[in-house]
From Swiss-Prot:
One Gene Ontology cellular component: extracellular region
UniProt keyword Secreted present: yes
Entry similarity comment: Belongs to the beta-defensin family.
Name of the protein this chain belongs to: Beta-defensin 126
Record keywords: Antibiotic, Antimicrobial, Cleavage on pair of basic residues, Defensin, Disulfide bond, Fertilization, Secreted, Signal
InterPro entries to which the protein is assigned, alphabetical: Beta-defensin
Disulphide bonds in the chain: 27-58, 34-52, 38-59
Signal peptide from the UniProt entry: 1-20
Span list, region In vitro binds to LPS, mediates antimicrobial activity and inhibits LPS-mediated inflammation: 21-63
UniProt entry tagged with the keyword Protein biosynthesis: no
Main location: secreted
Described purpose of this protein according to its UniProt entry: Highly glycosylated atypical beta-defensin involved in several aspects of sperm function. Facilitates sperm transport in the female reproductive tract and contributes to sperm protection against immunodetection; both functions are probably implicating the negative surface charge provided by its O-linked oligosaccharides in the sperm glycocalyx. Involved in binding of sperm to oviductal epithelial cells to form a sperm reservoir until ovulation.
GO annotation, biological process: defense response to Gram-negative bacterium; single fertilization
Amino acid sequence: MKSLLFTLAVFMLLAQLVSGSWYVKKCLNDVGICKKKCKPEELHVKNGWAMCGKQRDCCVPADKRANYPAFCVQTKTTRTSTVTATTATRATTATTTTLMMTTASMSSMTPTPVSPTG
């Protein structure tokens, strides 16, 4: 019985020491994962440094981004075609579209009084 308790105590101690690398910091209400660099299919969350620190980005997997579309920055790809006399070339440019409203655009909106009589 003593050896069983000793084995259990050693196992619990080792689990506490080893589990430090198993912990992954989450962000955006446990939807995103804090990483040094996001994968191409993941979305980068704007202002993720507030949740993950200055050296890490908050990356939202593609399957979970529909839950929080207002916080994510999506990369939109536009295709342009240029045709010359002998060859056809196609150039792809990537632009970043921010879906989150900035404080500057919010401050420009001023409320207007509305009368109840019309």
